[in-house]
């Protein structure tokens, strides 16, 4: 009897552990980087020095201050508005009639049915009508500052960043990843998110408000395995 009680407790603990839904992050890895320390090259007295020299990270006097090195930052203006809709309908119908009539019957059959003729009518009617539709709309706006983590061979910048906001007992986290063309960065060191290639935007939160929005393990059990 005691073993059955211990087994029931262990079974409930196992189910409670299965109730925790593991969230797989869309953007993995570190969301920041530290630029490499430039090597000390020989200074030849020229105005223009080689890359990765002691003047690494300098900003030209007569040019816009745009990110061009690993570790530089820029601001991304999040303006995402995606909407989609789909509708479909189909119908089919089929109708058939069959008539069988026999005027001359054998005597044996005539004695059974008591009639000199046999007639049969068969009617069939089949119809189908189906309609379906779906729609989705997503809007995301805000700002996030990202860091350049790599420079591609064509000059495009690979950026990544994260912003965390803690309010009372909950924490909201925004992560962003994408590839930026430096030509799309304006004079305020900002770029629109719809101009960034291969962008990934992740907005997640934790806390009791986020927990109440999740389905518990018993509800998921009925949802996945209940046949009705």
UniProtKB/Swiss-Prot annotation:
It is a lipid-anchor. A lipid is attached at residue 18 (S-diacylglycerol cysteine). Residues 1-17 form the signal peptide. A lipid is attached at residue 18 (N-palmitoyl cysteine). GO terms for biological process: bacterial-type flagellum-dependent cell motility. Pfam families: FlgH (PF02107). GO terms for cellular component: bacterial-type flagellum basal body, distal rod, L ring; cell outer membrane; plasma membrane. Keywords: Bacterial flagellum, Cell membrane, Lipoprotein, Membrane, Palmitate, Signal. Its main location: membrane. One of its GO terms (molecular function) is cytoskeletal motor activity. It is found in: Cell membrane; Bacterial flagellum basal body. InterPro entries: Flag_Lring. Belongs to the FlgH family. Assembles around the rod to form the L-ring and probably protects the motor/basal body from shearing forces during rotation. The basal body constitutes a major portion of the flagellar organelle and consists of four rings (L,P,S, and M) mounted on a central rod. This is Flagellar L-ring protein. It comes from Wigglesworthia glossinidia brevipalpis.
């Amino acid at each position: 009897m005691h073993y059955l009680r211990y087994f029931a407790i262990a079974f409930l603990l196992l189910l409670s552990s299965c109730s925790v839904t593991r969230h797989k992050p869309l953007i993995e890895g570190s969301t920041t980087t530290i630029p490499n320390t430039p090597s000390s090259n020989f200074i030849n007295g020229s105005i223009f020095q080689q890359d990765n020299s002691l003047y690494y990270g300098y900003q030209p006097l007569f040019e816009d201050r745009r990110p061009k090195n690993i570790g530089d930052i820029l601001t991304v203006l999040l303006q995402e508005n995606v909407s989609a809709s789909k509708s479909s309908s189909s119908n089919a119908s089929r109708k058939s009639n069959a008539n069988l009539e026999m005027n001359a019957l054998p005597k044996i059959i005539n004695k059974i049915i008591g009639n000199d003729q046999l007639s049969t009518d068969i009617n069939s009617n089949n119809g189908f009508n189906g309609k379906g539709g779906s729609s989705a709309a997503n809007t995301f706006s805000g700002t996030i500052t990202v860091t350049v983590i790599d420079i591609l061979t064509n000059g495009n910048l690979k950026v990544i960043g994260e912003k965390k906001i803690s309010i009372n007992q909950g924490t909201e986290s925004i992560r962003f990843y994408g590839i930026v063309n430096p030509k799309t960065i304006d004079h305020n060191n900002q770029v629109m998110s719809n101009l960034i290639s291969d962008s990934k935007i992740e907005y997640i939160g934790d806390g009791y408000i986020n927990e109440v929005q999740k389905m518990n393990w018993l509800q998921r059990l009925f949802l996945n395995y209940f046949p009705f």
